[in-house]
């Protein structure tokens, strides 16, 4: 029996679970939310106990320090040497990494070099990996890539309609993200459908501060909403989602604060989405609390829902129908108003939601027996997938 720590760092959060392996027994788990925002929330659950604290955590490096301090303070571990493996979710693996890999100095540098494909994530991932390497030097560190699941996309889906040289010479293509989550929840949905996954057509909606949708056919990703970077696709907490690229040079020419292309990209990544439209917050909970009295918050909510509905419709066409639609991740699992708003616009497709199940259901089916497409809420478990990969690659 060994202890493995699975770490899932999002753009503004860090979710973790401590496992006893290979039994896959969860010893403790926690979540650090609102990293980089005021009043970060640190939650730790172990045994029958739960602890929650609120204080500012400015970056992912300090979040790692808080996590490890909590493990010792709460006696989840006596010594850090008990932790023999650490698995890290990394968003962008490009065309270099198509499977999970043990961290070496070369691998860490490649993760950093791929930051152009995930500017909000890979730098934070790399900072977290380095912090763990310094604090847990004897543990085997493994990187698990969000992009790996999407390597099954056909070329017609991942290529952009640009001259071929930009793909062959510069690897400009769609890579996607959240692959570990999309893979896990599609497998769980197949179980709920009672069908072999090879016979299923499933749309998975990973909706958190970052959000993406994937069309999964026969257990394989055939299209996904994020693109060359996680900036593409639906509207998100601080990200625009899809935009007309002609806006970029127009803004550079007309806004003196945006001096170059990188300035525009930074604005679209860090100051847009829910935060940019509402002017209040990147957190959906804050938007929902304000939308009945604040017109900008109301608009942000409506735009957010609109973009997700459009991608669901698109993937119903890509799959030629679907067996199931799955909601997962922070907003998808927990926000009744968001699910209700999205599903209310999909009735033409024969999707019927049971209002009572939607309000009270935290896991399982929330559609009616007559719904042509089953609708599930499935808590994602990227951490379990990560822990399994660490166990397989341990020294």
From Swiss-Prot:
Subcellular locations according to the entry: Cytoplasm
Sites annotated Transition state stabilizer: 178, 239
Cofactor, how bound (note): Mg(2+). Can also accept Mn(2+).
Superkingdom as given in the UniProt entry: Bacteria
E.C. no: 2.7.2.1
InterPro entries on file: Ac/propionate_kinase, Aliphatic_acid_kin_short-chain, Aliphatic_acid_kinase_CS, ATPase_NBD
GO biological process: acetate metabolic process; acetyl-CoA biosynthetic process
List of residues binding ATP: 15, 206-210, 283-285, 330-334
Pfam families in the cross-refs: Acetate_kinase
PROSITE patterns cross-referenced by the UniProt entry: ACETATE_KINASE_1, ACETATE_KINASE_2
Positions of substrate binding: 89
UniProt catalytic activity: acetate + ATP = acetyl phosphate + ADP
Major location (coarse): cytoplasm
One MF term in the entry's GO annotations: acetate kinase activity
Alphabetized UniProt keyword annotations: ATP-binding, Cytoplasm, Kinase, Magnesium, Metal-binding, Nucleotide-binding, Transferase
Pathway: Metabolic intermediate biosynthesis; acetyl-CoA biosynthesis; acetyl-CoA from acetate: step 1/2
Cofactor(s) it depends on: Mg(2+); Mn(2+)
Broad EC category: transferase
Gene Ontology CC, one term: cytoplasm
Active site (record annotation): 146
Family statement drawn from the similarity comment of this UniProt entry: Belongs to the acetokinase family.
UniProt xrefs under HAMAP family: Acetate_kinase
Subunit-structure text: Homodimer.
Function of the protein: Catalyzes the formation of acetyl phosphate from acetate and ATP. Can also catalyze the reverse reaction.
Protein name: Acetate kinase 1
Organism listed in the record: Lactococcus lactis subsp. lactis (strain IL1403) (Streptococcus lactis)
Gene: ackA1
């Amino acid at each position: 029996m060994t202890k493995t720590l699975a770490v899932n760092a999002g753009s503004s959060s860090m979710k973790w679970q401590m496992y006893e392996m290979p039994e896959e027994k969860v010893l403790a788990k926690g979540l650090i939310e609102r990293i980089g925002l005021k009043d970060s929330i640190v939650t730790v659950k172990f045994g029958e106990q739960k602890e929650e604290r609120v204080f500012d955590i400015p970056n992912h490096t300090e979040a790692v320090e808080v996590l490890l301090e909590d493990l010792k303070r709460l006696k989840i571990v006596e010594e850090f040497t008990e932790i023999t493996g650490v698995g890290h979710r990394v968003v962008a693996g490009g065309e270099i990494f198509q499977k999970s890999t043990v961290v070496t100095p070369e691998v860490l540098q490649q993760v950093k070099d791929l930051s152009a494909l995930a500017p909000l994530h890979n730098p934070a991932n790399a900072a977290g990996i380095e912090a763990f390497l310094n604090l847990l030097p004897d543990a085997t560190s493994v990187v698990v890539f969000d992009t790996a699941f999407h390597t099954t996309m056909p070329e017609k889906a991942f290529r952009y309609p640009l001259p071929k040289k930009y793909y062959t010479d510069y690897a400009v293509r769609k890579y996607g993200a959240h692959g570990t989550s999309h893979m896990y929840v599609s497998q769980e949905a197949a179980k709920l459908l009672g069908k072999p996954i090879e016979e299923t057509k499933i749309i998975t909606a990973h909706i958190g501060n970052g959000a993406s949708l994937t069309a999964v056919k026969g257990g394989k990703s055939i299209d996904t909403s994020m693109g060359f970077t996680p900036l593409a696709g639906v509207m998100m907490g601080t990200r625009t989602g899809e935009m007309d690229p002609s806006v970029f040079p127009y803004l550079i020419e007309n806004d003196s604060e945006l001096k170059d292309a990188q300035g525009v990209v930074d604005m679209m990544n860090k100051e847009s989405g829910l935060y940019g439209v509402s002017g209040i917050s990147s957190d959906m909970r804050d938007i929902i609390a304000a939308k009945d009295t604040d017109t900008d918050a109301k608009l942000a909510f409506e735009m957010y829902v609109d973009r997700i509905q459009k991608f669901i419709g698109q993937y119903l066409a890509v799959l030629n129908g679907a067996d199931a639609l799955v909601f997962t991740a922070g907003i998808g699992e927990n926000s009744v108003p968001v699910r209700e708003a999205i599903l209310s616009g999909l009735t033409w497709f024969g999707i019927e939601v049971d209002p009572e199940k939607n309000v009270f259901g935290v896991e399982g089916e929330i559609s009616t027996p007559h719904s042509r497409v089953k609708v599930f809420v499935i808590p994602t478990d990227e951490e379990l997938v990560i822990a399994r990969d660490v166990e397989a690659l341990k020294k």
